[in-house]
């Protein structure tokens, strides 16, 4: 393979956002080795690199699709939205880590390195176009997530969560790799996604039993990363045991990266096997919506409740993936953008509450409104938006997602989604009711000893700043849903692999 300076620059420009983050990792390591008063600069470099990376990605959205590194990486508007979403989620999660590290006195450098490495892995995964790059970047994201989940080494629950996540994650990765090896063999030794599709057509393997076996392995591997039923067993334990700020991070980033991977593989490699993977994914999505919401009702831990809530939420996302057209993908991405604000806003609120009280029990939130009306209001708005209460952003996002699913003929999935959304409102409203409980009615000692917060509007606390941004997004972004949809649809129309 012949390389020249011009092609090197062209290829490098396509991954410039990731290169910026890699450079920030090197700078962070150097600062950690050379500077004593390093805390400010570590956070400054991390946040600045993410902002610059997002800015570069915004400019790349307008460009024509580009295949770089001999076709191994694809840059287009579709995966650009996913890359921006991952970088933006990390940008909102760093303030959560700042507050958590300050209160728990944990090492800052390692936390930021793992977080940025996971971000880089997720962003590369969104544009990966061959099996080797997909697997390497997926493992980069996964390994960093394992390390983050067990970061509080003195916490037994955190160690248990990391071990379960590692073992289950390793098993799912090996299943996915096995599916990839079948694809490689059946396609005649091809590794790039479009070439695999062409190879399967040429070898007339699409009607064989082997393709069904490949689909089962690949769906199982991706379903684990997305916490879809029945591959969700690790999720509640990891959510409960890992640091809350860490859970906030990979509850969003891993799902965004997983959705990007699912859409790219199913819409490219298995485009001629629509009936097979549509049926399997629809069954998994329906099970996720039902089990996630019904089991969430019984939970007493806030983090476990959010774990099952996230399982049901990813079931809703799958409606857009199963639709398999530009409208379905546009609705999925629109809801994903709203979900970032809703989910991170909720996790930011419970992170702050946990740092001030040291409890995760749902009952201990009783009477919070009397002690901290702003935090209580922000948490209530985020939860209600997750439930899809109008006129919050979650309502408009779900409405558009279900409408596109209905148009695509997914009547059963949409009906189940509507029914389970009503169920989810029950357990979200139950928490809101506890929050506004009158003092001394059902309040516990945690709330009675709770220290009233300062004014959020003038607060210098980074986590409170993240809360404000997320709550504004989850509350008011639904108002501008039409412009958001128009931008997403226009961006998707420029992508080369979307089949209308």
From Swiss-Prot:
Gene Ontology BP annotations: ATP synthesis coupled electron transport; photosynthesis, light reaction
Top-level taxonomic group: Eukaryota
TM region positions: 14-34, 41-61, 78-98, 116-136, 166-186, 211-231, 242-262, 277-297, 305-325, 335-355, 376-396, 409-429, 467-487
InterPro entries, alphabetized: NADH-Q_OxRdtase_suN/2, ND/Mrp_TM, Ndh2_N
Keywords: Chloroplast, Membrane, NAD, NADP, Plastid, Plastoquinone, Quinone, Thylakoid, Translocase, Transmembrane, Transmembrane helix, Transport
Reaction catalysed by this enzyme: a plastoquinone + NADH + (n+1) H(+)(in) = a plastoquinol + NAD(+) + n H(+)(out); a plastoquinone + NADPH + (n+1) H(+)(in) = a plastoquinol + NADP(+) + n H(+)(out)
Subcellular location: Plastid, Chloroplast thylakoid membrane
Membrane topology category: Multi-pass membrane protein
Principal cellular location given in the protein's record: plastid
Enzyme class: translocase
Record's GO cellular component terms: chloroplast thylakoid membrane
Enzyme Commission no: 7.1.1.-
GO molecular function: NADH dehydrogenase (ubiquinone) activity; quinone binding
PANTHER family: NADH DEHYDROGENASE
Main function: NDH shuttles electrons from NAD(P)H:plastoquinone, via FMN and iron-sulfur (Fe-S) centers, to quinones in the photosynthetic chain and possibly in a chloroplast respiratory chain. The immediate electron acceptor for the enzyme in this species is believed to be plastoquinone. Couples the redox reaction to proton translocation, and thus conserves the redox energy in a proton gradient.
Family assignment from sequence similarity: Belongs to the complex I subunit 2 family.
Subunit field text: NDH is composed of at least 16 different subunits, 5 of which are encoded in the nucleus.
Name of the protein in question: NAD(P)H-quinone oxidoreductase subunit 2 A, chloroplastic
Protein's organism: Anthoceros angustus (Hornwort)
Lineage, top ranks: Eukaryota, Viridiplantae, Streptophyta, Embryophyta, Anthocerotophyta
């Amino acid at each position: 393979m012949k390389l020249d300076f011009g092609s090197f620059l062209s290829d490098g420009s396509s991954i410039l956002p990731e290169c910026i983050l890699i450079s920030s990792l090197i700078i962070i390591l150097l600062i950690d080795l050379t500077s004593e008063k390093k805390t400010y600069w570590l956070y400054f470099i991390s946040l600045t690199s993410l902002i610059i990376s997002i800015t570069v990605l915004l400019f790349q959205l307008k460009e024509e699709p580009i295949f770089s590194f001999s076709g191994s990486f694809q840059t287009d508007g579709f995966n650009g939205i996913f890359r921006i979403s991952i970088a933006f989620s990390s940008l909102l999660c760093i303030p959560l880590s700042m507050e958590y590290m300050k209160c728990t006195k944990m090492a800052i450098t390692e936390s930021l390195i793992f977080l940025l490495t996971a971000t880089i892995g997720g962003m590369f995964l969104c544009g990966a176009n061959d099996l080797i790059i997909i697997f390497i970047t997926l493992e980069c994201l996964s390994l960093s997530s394992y390390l983050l989940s067990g970061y509080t080494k003195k916490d037994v629950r955190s160690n248990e969560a990391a071990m379960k996540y590692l073992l289950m994650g390793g098993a799912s990765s090996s299943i996915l790799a096995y599916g990839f090896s079948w694809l490689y063999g059946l396609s005649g030794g091809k590794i790039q996604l479009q070439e695999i599709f062409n190879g399967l057509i040429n070898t007339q393997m699409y009607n064989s039993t082997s393709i069904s076996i490949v689909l089962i392995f690949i769906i199982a591997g991706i379903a684990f990363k997305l916490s879809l039923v029945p591959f969700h067993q690790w999720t509640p334990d990891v959510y409960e045991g890992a640091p809350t700020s860490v859970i906030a991070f990979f509850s969003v980033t891993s799902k965004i990266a997983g959705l990007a991977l699912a859409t790219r593989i199913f819409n490219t490699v298995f485009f001629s096997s629509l009936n097979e993977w549509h049926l399997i994914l629809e069954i998994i999505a329906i099970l996720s919506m039902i089990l996630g919401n019904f089991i969430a009702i019984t939970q007493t831990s806030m983090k476990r409740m959010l774990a099952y809530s996230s399982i049901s939420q990813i079931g809703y996302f799958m409606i857009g993936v199963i639709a398999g057209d530009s409208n379905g993908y546009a609705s999925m991405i629109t809801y994903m953008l709203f979900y970032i604000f809703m989910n991170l806003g909720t996790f930011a609120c419970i992170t702050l509450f946990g740092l001030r009280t040291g409890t995760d029990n749902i009952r201990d939130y009783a009477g919070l409104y009397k002690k901290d009306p702003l935090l209580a209001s922000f948490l209530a708005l985020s939860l209600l938006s997750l439930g899809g209460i109008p006129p919050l952003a979650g309502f408009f996002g779900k409405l558009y997602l279900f409408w596109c699913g209905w148009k695509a003929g997914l009547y059963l999935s949409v009906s189940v989604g509507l029914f389970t959304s009503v169920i989810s409102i029950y357990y979200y409203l139950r928490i809101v009711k506890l929050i506004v409980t009158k003092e001394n009615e059902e309040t516990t000692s945690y709330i009675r000893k709770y220290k009233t917060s300062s004014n959020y509007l003038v607060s210098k606390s980074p986590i409170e700043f993240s809360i404000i941004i997320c709550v504004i997004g989850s509350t008011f972004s639904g108002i501008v849903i039409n412009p958001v949809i128009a931008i997403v649809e226009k961006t998707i129309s420029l992508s080369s692999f979307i089949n209308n």
